[in-house]
Amino acid sequence: MKSSSSIFRETSEKKSERWMMMNIGRFSPFFLSSFCITLFFTGFFVYQNPFKSIADQNVLSFQPQIDPECDLFKGHWVPDKRGSLYTNSSCATIPDSKNCIKQGRPDKDFLFWRWKPDGCDLPRFNPKAFLSMVRGKKMNFIGDSVARNHMESLLCLLSMEETPKDIYKDGEDRNRIWYFPKHDFTLSTSWTKFLVEERERRDSNNTGTGLFDLDIGKIDEGWFNGLPNTDIAIVSAAHWFFRPIFIHRGDETLGCIYCNLPNMTQISPEEGFKLVYSAVLRQINECEMCKKDLVTVLRTISPAHFENGTWDTGGTCSRTSPFGENKIDLQSNEMKIRKSQIEQLEGITKRGNKAKKFAVLDVTRVMQMRPDGHPNGYWGNKWMKGYNDCVHWCLPGPIDAWNDFLMAIIRQLR
């Protein structure tokens, strides 16, 4: 039911509209010309480029609508003859280590599948529409090398619409910045193993021992210092957690993952994820220097598919087709960690700053079905013979679907 004040406002507005229509003929041609010119320049200065804004709106208006009640991450993979929008030769920025076809992978069936949610459709990635949505924005992928893998997929997809400028690379090629000048869009990566401050223990020869100390009371400043300049942050980190790690909160030692030491609290990997992600998401939510409308997308753990061993004991991932839904292990460590990550995100959204937006990119279950999507031995390995990559994803490949999800998420948050 409308309030009396709103009804009065609508009545007054209608009277004003009728008066304008009845008396418009009395206005001089000069006034009409001035009015049109004023309207044009108002639009120009307020919207900077009204023509581009209208073009962006037209592009987005033709995009399929997504049922907000549909769970995009529950479904299965179906054959798709179209394949990816790009090829291993059409995208110049694919690293050799992810360019599986270039490295000699003989099968190509893994390229011709798409994700189909149960009960709805996930629209195919549209680079023109995506760039329209993120015009003038800065997007940062924060995490380990799988986060970089994700960014590289998006970079290839967007390059089909506009060639980006490579404007920054650090000495170790871990942090990169790309710029799309026609859309004033910045795409970057910020490398971090654990998201929080970490230190590797060293022996008497100053050689790394593989033992890490994490302080969940301190965020890794390498990425967090750049957060105030970010509009959309895709946050993830996972694969460095599967090793001996001592977890601290300041001077207090909370326990250890994979240590089995006497008088030391044993922490499971999923509990370690809970402690880290709870601290990280809280810091993001409470970041006073960050933009009020900052969007944070938490990407859940991406599963590895080693068989007949691990990465350092000859494990492989040589399958050439997806798994069916019945092959998913709902009790796997990855699914437990996924649950822990999502619980921390839900906790923040329930009590968080309503201006800041949070969303989940839930790839764990989706990618458990794609043991065929990894480089395996086709990653240009010259120095580590016998080691197979069953963690990262071929480009092009199943990881491209993550950007179908990302586009849907950003559109829903608009």
Curated annotation (Swiss-Prot):
In the bilayer, the protein is annotated as: Single-pass type II membrane protein
Topological domain ranges for the Cytoplasmic compartment: 1-26
| GO BP term, pick one | xyloglucan metabolic process
Q: Motif range for DXXH motif?
A: 389-392
Q: Taking the first listed entry, what is the main subcellular location of this protein, grouped into a coarse class?
A: membrane
Q: What is its EC number?
A: 2.3.1.-
Please report any disulfide bonds recorded for this protein chain, giving both cysteine positions: 70-120, 91-156, 100-394, 317-390
- The active site lies at 145, 389, 392
Could you cite one Gene Ontology molecular function of this protein? O-acetyltransferase activity
Gene Ontology terms, cellular component aspect? Golgi apparatus; membrane
> Which keywords fit this entry according to its UniProt record?
Disulfide bond, Glycoprotein, Membrane, Signal-anchor, Transferase, Transmembrane, Transmembrane helix
Its family remark reads: Belongs to the PC-esterase family. TBL subfamily.
> What PANTHER family would the database entry show?
PROTEIN TRICHOME BIREFRINGENCE-LIKE 9-RELATED, XYLOGLUCAN O-ACETYLTRANSFERASE 2
Full protein name: xyloglucan O-acetyltransferase 2
